[in-house]
């Protein structure tokens, strides 16, 4: 499990029923969980193990994998075994569509190896087969004591339910808009499926709900209503958010509003990666969103000014980038070696206007000289000026001071253990 420092005020969170997914708690009093999904062919064991490992190292606490055919289902226990040999015990979530009931029955080792099953009510079965095939998955979840996520997506919404609601709406004196009917269909699909699963014997502490759409305002509306009508743990995410900056902005806008309202027990930011791009980016964006909102703390904060006409030198920018990269690189080791280091705040400022003040507010900071200022850089530690650096090696000297500060402040348990 992640050892990230948890800042969320639980009294402000929507109260939900806690669900254990492997050893990761979702909902209840547990911190908001970051999760991701592979885009490998699950039958390709080497590629899937490699990507799950990368996502886990980036900080994904749950990793979902596609289970779409026999070869993929047969690979799941082997993937689980390979990961554990590497010391990686991240819970794996099976993503099932259309034939999940068959795959789980025919591959019991897969059913056992997975920590959770994702079911899409829109394609678990059609017509008379829908209830039967849904019940088969629930029976297996009960048999192996596994939680499920009932994951509704408006791109694969239950057409029969949508048609029924549209027909009923057309008979109303003041009919709702098409968007409102669509939202209600998404919500009802999730709630009806959860109720059916509970009637079949699956506990409320085994059910997570999601109701994903691709429009920001629709997503906010859907989850706001769903949160009022259910106390199930909620998985929140904007589906098909898109590529690059657009995807990051859209997801952050939607999730930021919901999280601020206390809605969301686990999140995924679904980014379309560039060809050959880094799949772990979506994990980092999730972490950054939770961190800037003050819900969780994953890595030290490096505050740096944006630059202006007073900072024609790029020294402060280069130093800030270097320090941030070094902190991120060392965090996997430092989390264990220096408990609490994720709460560290470092300021690297570029001129006298805000530099000294911002540096004083940080745990440790430096105010580099701006254009026309004296070539001196005061260093502040815990609000007090401790040194003034001069010359051509200011950056290197500050890095040494920072390293000493980290060892002194956070390395106390190392000294005790020695």
UniProtKB/Swiss-Prot annotation:
The keyword Metal-binding applies. Its EC number is 1.17.7.3. GO terms for biological process: isopentenyl diphosphate biosynthetic process, methylerythritol 4-phosphate pathway; terpenoid biosynthetic process. Pfam families: GcpE. Pathway: Isoprenoid biosynthesis; isopentenyl diphosphate biosynthesis via DXP pathway; isopentenyl diphosphate from 1-deoxy-D-xylulose 5-phosphate: step 5/6. It comes from the Bacteria. Its cofactor is [4Fe-4S] cluster. Keywords: 4Fe-4S, Iron, Iron-sulfur, Isoprene biosynthesis, Metal-binding, Oxidoreductase. Binds 1 [4Fe-4S] cluster. The keyword Oxidoreductase applies. InterPro entries: Dihydropteroate_synth-like_sf, IspG_bac, IspG_bac-typ, NO2/SO3_Rdtase_4Fe4S_sf. GO terms for molecular function: 4 iron, 4 sulfur cluster binding; 4-hydroxy-3-methylbut-2-en-1-yl diphosphate synthase activity (ferredoxin); 4-hydroxy-3-methylbut-2-enyl-diphosphate synthase activity (flavodoxin); iron ion binding. [4Fe-4S] cluster binds at residues 305, 308, 351, 358. It catalyses: (2E)-4-hydroxy-3-methylbut-2-enyl diphosphate + oxidized [flavodoxin] + H2O + 2 H(+) = 2-C-methyl-D-erythritol 2,4-cyclic diphosphate + reduced [flavodoxin]. Converts 2C-methyl-D-erythritol 2,4-cyclodiphosphate (ME-2,4cPP) into 1-hydroxy-2-methyl-2-(E)-butenyl 4-diphosphate. PANTHER family: 4-HYDROXY-3-METHYLBUT-2-EN-1-YL DIPHOSPHATE SYNTHASE (PTHR30454), 4-HYDROXY-3-METHYLBUT-2-EN-1-YL DIPHOSPHATE SYNTHASE (FERREDOXIN), CHLOROPLASTIC (PTHR30454:SF0). Belongs to the IspG family. This is 4-hydroxy-3-methylbut-2-en-1-yl diphosphate synthase (flavodoxin).
């Amino acid at each position: 499990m992640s050892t990230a420092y948890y800042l969320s005020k639980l009294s402000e969170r929507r109260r939900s029923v806690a669900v254990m997914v492997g050893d990761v708690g979702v909902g209840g009093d547990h911190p908001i969980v970051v999760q991701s999904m592979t885009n490998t062919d699950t039958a390709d064991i080497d590629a899937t193990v490699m990507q799950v490992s990368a996502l886990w190292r980036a900080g994904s606490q749950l990793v979902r994998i596609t289970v779409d055919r026999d070869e993929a289902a047969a690979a799941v226990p082997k993937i689980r075994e390979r990961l554990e040999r590497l010391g990686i015990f991240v819970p794996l979530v099976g993503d099932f569509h259309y034939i999940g009931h068959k795959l789980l029955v025919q591959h019991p080792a897969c059913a056992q190896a997975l920590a959770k099953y994702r079911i899409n009510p829109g394609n678990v079965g059609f017509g008379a087969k829908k209830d039967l095939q849904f019940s088969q998955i629930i029976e297996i979840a009960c048999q192996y004591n596994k939680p499920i996520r009932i994951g509704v997506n408006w791109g694969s919404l239950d057409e029969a339910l949508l048609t029924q609601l549209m027909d009923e709406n057309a008979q109303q004196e003041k009919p709702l808009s098409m968007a409102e009917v669509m939202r209600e269909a998404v919500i009802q699909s999730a709630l009806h499926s959860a109720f059916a699963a509970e009637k079949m014997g699956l506990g409320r502490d085994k059910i997570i709900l999601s109701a994903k759409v691709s429009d920001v305002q629709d997503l906010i509306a859907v989850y706001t209503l769903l949160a009022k009508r259910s106390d199930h743990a909620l998985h929140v995410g904007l589906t098909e958010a898109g590529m690059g900056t657009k995807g990051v902005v859209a997801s952050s806008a939607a999730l930021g509003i919901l999280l601020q309202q206390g809605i969301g027990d686990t999140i995924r930011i679904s980014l379309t990666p560039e060809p050959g791009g880094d799949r772990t980016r979506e994990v980092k964006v999730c972490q950054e969103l939770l961190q800037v909102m003050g819900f969780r703390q994953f890595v030290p904060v490096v505050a740096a000014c944006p630059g202006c006409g007073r900072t024609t030198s790029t020294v402060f920018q280069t130093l800030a980038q270097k320090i941030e990269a070094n902190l991120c690189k060392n965090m996997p080791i430092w989390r264990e070696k220096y408990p609490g280091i994720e709460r560290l705040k470092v300021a690297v400022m570029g001129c006298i206007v805000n530099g000294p003040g911002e540096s004083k507010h940080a745990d440790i900071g430096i105010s580099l000289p701006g254009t026309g200022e004296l070539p001196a850089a005061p260093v502040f530690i815990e609000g007090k000026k401790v040194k003034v650096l001069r010359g051509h090696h200011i950056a290197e000297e500050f890095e040494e001071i920072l390293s000493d500060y980290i060892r002194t402040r956070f390395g106390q348990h190392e000294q005790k253990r020695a």
